[in-house]
Amino acid sequence: LEFENKLWEMADKLRGNIQPSDYKSVILGLIFLKYISDSFEEKYNELVAEGDGFEEDRDAYHEDNVFFVPPSARWEFIKKSAKQSTIGQIIDDAMIAIERENKNLKGVLPKNYARPELDKTKLGELIDLFSFNLGSKESKAQDILGRVYEYFLGKFGSSEGEFYTPPSIVKLLVGMIE
């Protein structure tokens, strides 16, 4: 992936005063948020094209195993808010809203973006880098999400002196998400 090194450089800059295990959850949480938002957006556009008015019907998404993403948690909203000093709280609120709409995610998503030691300017810059689509059918076919997760888990593991997550485990995790 051509964007891997750029993302890693940003993640490394983001680190600052926080532990690698903490910024790992920041990065992987953003990747997940981008993925479900992209998947939602693709389904949303399909529903709009059908013209039946079901684009805000949660059941229409859940039927296709797509997480419903409320407007305040959609990537376009997050990206437009990236330069605000409150971006950390905006992301935490987005994670809470997603959990509220998707009961099987309750208590799973990270909600630690508003903490003071996380540089909000760098967080906004990281959000700006996420311009690639992770949740489209084409991305799923190319296993972009799996490759991104595998790359980051490998980098986080090697930077912390921990074990490397085998590709089979990454495939399992991504399969569970999808």
Placement of each model-derived feature along the sequence:
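Non-catalytic, mostly N-terminal accessory regions of nucleic-acid modification and defense proteins
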Residues: 1-177
